[in-house]
Design a protein with these regions (language model features):
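Hydrophobic/aromatic side-chain positions at a characteristic register within alpha-helices
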Residues: 25, 32, 44-45, 90, ...
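Hydrophobic, small-residue-rich alpha-helical packing segments that form membrane-like cores
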Residues: 190, 197, 209-325, 329
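Amphipathic alpha-helical segments of tetratricopeptide repeats
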Residues: 41-42, 61-69, 110-121, 193-197, ...
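Alpha-solenoid helical repeat architecture
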Residues: 48-54, 80-84, 122-127, 158-161, ...
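TPR-repeat structural position
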Residues: 30, 47-50, 102, 182, ...
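Conserved small-residue packing positions in alpha-helical repeats and bundles
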Residues: 4, 21-24, 40-42, 61, ...
Length: 541
């Protein structure tokens, strides 16, 4: 199946680009040295080595006459073209994004787009106006006849760089769960889609549709989510015979595994995940492979295949342990905590190691910007301390999770974190009469049920958790009537409920369409909400 040659970027970087850079610096060819530094930084990012990319860009910045990698001076010592300057800004934006410097990353991405003749607005009025232009003027420009071949080559490079900058922008704005950020993110995805179509590169179009599918799922837009995925599948048939096409195929298979997981098709998700991982290993794409492994773990975990979970985590550890990927390690330790809590004795990393990592890095810029991941981490830590009746530590991590829940979205990590938070909240409600909490305000079942309503309205594109959350909600309803609940059922939910969710067509049919399944879940959720509202009124009375 894999007919293209494997990637040799690491060898090229070590044996070609780095020596060429040093050679040009020694002989005083600063312009050439700057070019090779950009190439080396891009290769490092492609290999998921953000630290080396930062060092290359800092050296390139010094050639331009800037005292640091992230300051701005209009006059440069080295003469570079506008496209190279835009590439420089785009690479710095990506490095800042990976380092958690979100505001600076946005500024650099905007600067790169301005240099590429593609301005991105700053205000809500500008967003409205630019959206109108993208839907009208840009669609007209896509039908214009192509230029001569030499101009096309330059234009293609500019368009590809625009796509990269716009992809960074929507990911940056997607980290913030505000209405304003969502507007900016939606505009960035629209502009990215238009630039990708204008480039006429099938691989670029497929990658863009995969990205748009991911964004729509995060925003809870089920129709756009499945539409973009379907478009990516249709376009992907032309992409198999190139390296870029194979990478786009790997991205698509990862997205399909993600979708199958969100919808509850766990066996299909696992199968697609292993296929995507095979391509990632062939292409030597560690970042994408790590993402695939995260999806694989979650599918195996919900399927209750804990031996496979350990195997996946060991593979993930081999990928990220030698680098400086703090976010990757946070996702890894979050998965380890899940296995410790609900894995029935299976272990990958001890609790002390997980706790030490979180305590060491939780205040870093990188993790501060990742609310979805940290919500799950703090909620899992709270549940662990609850098992040992360490209520002060439970309260400490629960309060941190409580601050994060409003800042999350419908992504897989966001939905998973929300589920963990609901488990903590129900447990806290049950323990409240015992007076074990010193700094937490009293909660009523009615207040707790508001969180369940928010979950179902926000996480509509992640129905794999809906069954368990519905049962957890029912326990709150019963508690509101009887003022009694079993602590064991809250602490060990996977033993009774979650492991039964959508196993081999129990609630989902593997052959059903995505749209049909989602519509079915929406109808079920609506019925449950109506019934629950009636029961709430009974509790109040």
């Amino acid at each position: 199946m894999l007919t293209t040659k494997p990637c040799h970027c690491k060898e090229v970087l070590k044996l070609v680009l780095s020596p060429l850079t040093q050679h040009c610096l020694v002989i005083g060819e600063t312009t050439c040295a700057f070019y090779y530094l950009l190439e080396a930084a891009a290769a490092s990012l492609d290999l998921s080595d953000n630290y080396m990319a930062f060092l290359y860009l800092r050296k390139a910045s010094s050639l331009l006459g800037q005292p640091s990698a992230f300051s701005f001076y209009k006059k440069h010592k080295v003469k570079i073209c506008q496209f190279e300057e835009a590439t420089f800004c785009c690479l710095r934006s990506e490095v800042c994004f990976n380092m958690g410097q979100i505001t600076l990353a946005k500024k650099l991405a905007r600067q790169a787009l301005r240099l590429l003749k593609r301005n991105f607005p700053w205000t809500w009025f500008g967003v409205i106006f630019q959206t109108f232009l993208e839907k009208c003027w840009r669609s007209c420009s896509l039908s214009q006849p192509p230029d001569n071949p030499s101009e096309n080559k330059k234009k293609l490079a500019v368009l590809q760089q625009q796509v990269q900058c716009l992809s960074l922008l929507w990911q940056l704005y997607n980290l913030e769960a505000t209405a304003s950020s969502r507007r900016f993110a939606r505009l960035a995805t629209l502009m990215q889609e238009n630039s990708a179509k204008e480039s006429a590169s099938e691989a670029q179009v497929v990658s863009t549709y995969v990205a748009l599918s991911q964004f729509s799922q995060n925003m809870g837009d089920k129709e756009k989510w499945l539409h973009c995925e379907q478009m990516a599948i249709q376009k992907n048939s032309l992409c198999w015979f190139s390296r870029e096409g194979l990478l786009a195929t790997a991205q698509l298979m990862q997205a399909l595994a993600y979708t199958k997981l969100c919808l509850g098709h766990l066996d299909s998700s696992i199968r697609l995940g292993f296929q995507a991982r095979e391509i990632c290993r062939h292409l030597k794409k560690p970042a994408l492979e790590n993402l695939v492994l995260s999806v694989l773990f979650r599918s195996a975990f919900l399927k209750k295949k804990f031996d496979l979970c350990v195997h996946v985590l060991e593979s993930q550890w081999a990928l990220i342990s030698e680098g400086h990927d703090v976010l990757g390690l946070a996702c890894f330790y979050s998965a380890c905590l899940d296995l410790l809590l609900y894995g029935k004795g299976w272990l990958c990393r001890p609790f002390g190691e997980c706790l030490h990592f979180i305590q060491h890095y939780e205040h870093s810029c990188i993790l501060n910007s990742q609310s979805n991941v940290m919500l799950g981490v703090h909620s899992s830590l709270a549940m662990w301390f609850a098992q040992d009746s360490q209520w002060k530590l439970f309260e400490h991590h629960y309060s941190k999770a409580h601050q994060l829940v409003k800042r999350t979205n419908a992504s897989l990590f966001g939905s998973h974190g929300f589920v963990r938070f609901l488990e903590c909240h129900v447990l806290m409600l049950q323990k409240m009469p015992e007076g074990v909490f010193a700094h937490t305000a009293s909660e009523t079942p009615r207040q707790t049920l508001k969180y369940f309503k928010e979950f179902f309205s926000r996480c509509v594109t992640c129905p794999v958790y809906h069954q368990w959350v519905s049962e957890l909600k029912a326990s709150v309803m019963r508690y509101g009537k009887r003022e009694s609940m079993s602590l064991t059922n809250v602490i060990r939910p996977f033993d009774t409920c979650l492991t039964r969710i959508w196993i081999e067509g129990e609630f989902l049919e593997e052959n059903n369409s995505f749209e049909g399944n989602l519509q079915r879940f929406v109808r079920v959720a609506d019925v449950k909400e109506n019934k629950d509202e009636e029961e709430i009124q009974e509790c109040i009375c």
